């Protein structure tokens, strides 16, 4: 700690607020909140000994701090969460889960809504379910819902333009809403059943359906009664696959944390109507924090973006801001939420179940981490690197017969793909068929940027030529001694070569990788991933360019109208044969827009 820090904390206000601790480079390394800023800072700086390990390590690096005063501790808690997400401080608990999870959506404002998969929650009147842990779990849920309830599966444009029942209706997998085979009222009732099912209220739904089945049977509507019976059986079959963990039919989430050094895993179990319906594991970098602090950060982060907050949340240990966090949950849910630390009984057994799952997941993660460490250490050795190759970047070019040239950058951190760091590049200046010039441009753009840290190892896809070009770029930017660069060339089977070859600057022969094949395979995975990423991006650009048509230049014809026209007529030729009146009758079209289309098609034909 510096003398200025000791002086400044003594003049800190005795108000609620947030403090941001900084190291000698001005980087924010810790963000915290306090009811009384002066007292909290005094707990750090008024004494030099008696701190826990995390605080001791932190204070050795603090040379400055900033303060933000808030009106209440509640506001400070919210601001703390916002700043942690923004700055990702080294010594805060960071949830390593930035991806958006898939959700299910039903837009009840539509007369015949479908079940959709989305990754963003819109500000609308639709009903959302999730988030789900994977695309596979979403598909499984959709498959169950479609099998039981038979909602429409076609897109809105197809639905609006269909003139006869689809194949799904013909095989009894759809209610046939597109061709008026089901009334709006009946479809709405089915949608209501789907919502109950997805909310975990299947027992309530079954009871109601049994009553309806009996009513239909009493009225001698035996066919309808049989349909309801089949629906009940399908729902019951689904429920049989779920594990009953509680008899009180309460919705609750169960959260526990396993920790080992700077790595942790939080497991959350989802209990709906007494059934264990799913779970999810979240890896954490602990920042040397303990379980209570990790659980505190997790509960705040998770439920801040969760679509559903149950009435009861069981946690393994009491968290630091227990009362404040519970108030935040109540505020978001709009009704009571209990944040409970069970001591005994069925609820404690649920917490222990979550803890066992967290420990197993952590053991798996640590095993993967240890294997990655061994591989990266071997790579460091064979490449003669002075630093551990924690961050590796690999670049690749792609084009189609010299057109639409692009490049990709993929990043592996600690031996694993870090997809949030991937970058795509559209070639701006280099000639389309000049691979060296394209790579020179991309490396120059990447290494001139300060948005991302420099890599420990940079790999280019290619042999000595590409490597020489990369070295030239590094020299031009004054980076030739900042990190290692290597080229990966494919084996030449005609020469009897068995393995791909890694080349280093200033060496005529490739690196000997026979004793470190795992290291070679890691570099190959990088190269293959860069190739995949570049090819995918190049294909998308090519498809987008190929997808342009005469309609793109027609005034008043946007994306939706173009989609309706192309879906209806399947091509420009058939569209040109339609009359203005036929064009104007399509959904979303007007007479003026139809006349514009007709004129444009006539000019295009000429």
Swiss-Prot record:
GO cellular component assignments: cytoplasm; excinuclease repair complex
Pfam name, any one: GIY-YIG
Protein keywords: Cytoplasm, DNA damage, DNA excision, DNA repair, Excision nuclease, SOS response
Domain of life, source organism: Bacteria
Compartments it resides in: Cytoplasm
Alphabetized GO MF terms: DNA binding; excinuclease ABC activity
GO terms classed as biological process: nucleotide-excision repair; SOS response
Family per similarity comment: Belongs to the UvrC family.
Record's subunit section: Interacts with UvrB in an incision complex.
Protein name: UvrABC system protein C
Organism, scientific name: Desulforapulum autotrophicum (strain ATCC 43914 / DSM 3382 / VKM B-1955 / HRM2) (Desulfobacterium autotrophicum)
């Amino acid at each position: 700690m510096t003398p200025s820090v000791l002086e400044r904390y003594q003049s800190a206000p005795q108000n609620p607020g947030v403090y941001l601790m900084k190291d000698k480079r001005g980087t924010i390394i810790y963000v915290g909140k306090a009811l009384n800023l002066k007292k909290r800072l005094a707990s750090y700086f008024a004494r030099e000994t008696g701190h826990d390990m995390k605080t001791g390590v932190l204070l050795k690096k603090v040379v400055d701090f900033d303060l933000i005063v808030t009106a209440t501790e509640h506001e400070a808690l919210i601001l703390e969460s916002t700043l942690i997400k923004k700055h990702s401080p080294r010594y805060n608990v960071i949830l390593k889960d930035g991806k958006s999870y898939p959700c299910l959506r039903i837009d009840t404002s539509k007369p015949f809504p479908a079940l959709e998969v989305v990754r963003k929650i819109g500000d609308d009147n639709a009903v959302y379910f999730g988030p789900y842990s994977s695309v596979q779990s979403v598909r499984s849920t959709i498959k169950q819902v479609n099998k039981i309830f038979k909602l429409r599966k076609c897109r809105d444009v197809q639905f609006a333009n269909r003139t006869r029942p689809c194949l799904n209706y013909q095989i009894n997998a759809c209610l046939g809403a597109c061709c008026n085979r089901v009334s709006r009222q009946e479809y709405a009732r089915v949608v209501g059943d789907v919502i109950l099912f997805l909310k975990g209220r299947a027992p309530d739904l079954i009871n109601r359906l049994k009553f309806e089945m009996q009513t239909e049977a009493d009225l001698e509507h035996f066919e309808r009664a049989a349909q309801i019976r089949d629906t009940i059986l399908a729902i019951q079959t689904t429920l049989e696959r779920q594990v009953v963990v509680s008899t009180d039919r309460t919705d609750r989430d169960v959260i526990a944390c396993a920790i080992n050094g700077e790595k942790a895993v939080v497991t959350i179990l989802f209990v709906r109507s007494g059934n264990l319906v799913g779970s999810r594991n979240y890896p954490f970098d602990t920042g040397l924090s303990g379980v209570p602090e990790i659980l505190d950060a997790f509960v705040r982060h998770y439920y801040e973006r969760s679509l559903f907050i149950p009435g009861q949340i069981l946690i393994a240990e009491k968290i630091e801001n227990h009362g404040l966090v519970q108030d935040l949950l109540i505020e978001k849910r709009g009704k009571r939420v209990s944040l409970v630390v069970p001591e005994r009984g069925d609820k404690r057994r649920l917490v222990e179940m979550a803890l066992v799952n967290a420990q197993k997941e952590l053991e798996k993660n640590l095993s993967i981490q240890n294997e990655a460490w061994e591989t990266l250490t071997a790579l460091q050795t064979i490449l003669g690197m002075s630093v551990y190759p924690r961050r590796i970047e690999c670049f690749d070019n792609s084009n189609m017969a010299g057109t639409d040239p692009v490049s990709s950058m993929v990043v592996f951190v600690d031996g694993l793909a870090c997809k949030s760091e991937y970058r795509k590049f559209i070639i701006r200046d280099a000639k389309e068929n000049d691979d060296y010039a394209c790579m020179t441009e991309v490396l120059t753009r990447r290494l001139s940027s300060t948005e991302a840290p420099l890599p420990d190892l940079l790999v280019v896809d290619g042999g000595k030529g590409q490597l020489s070009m990369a070295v030239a770029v590094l020299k031009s930017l004054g980076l030739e001694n900042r990190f290692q660069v290597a080229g990966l060339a494919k084996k030449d089977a005609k020469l009897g070569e068995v393995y791909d070859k890694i080349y280093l600057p200033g060496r005529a022969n490739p690196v000997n990788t026979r004793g470190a094949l795992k290291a070679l395979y890691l570099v190959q995975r990088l190269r293959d991933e860069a190739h995949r990423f570049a090819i995918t991006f190049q294909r998308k650009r090519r498809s987008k360019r190929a997808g342009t048509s005469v309609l793109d230049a027609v005034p008043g014809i946007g994306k939706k109208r173009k989609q309706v026209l192309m879906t209806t007529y399947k091509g420009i030729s058939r569209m040109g044969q339609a009359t203005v009146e036929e064009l104007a009758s399509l959904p979303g079209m007007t007479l003026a827009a139809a006349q514009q289309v007709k004129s444009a098609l006539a000019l295009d034909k000429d």
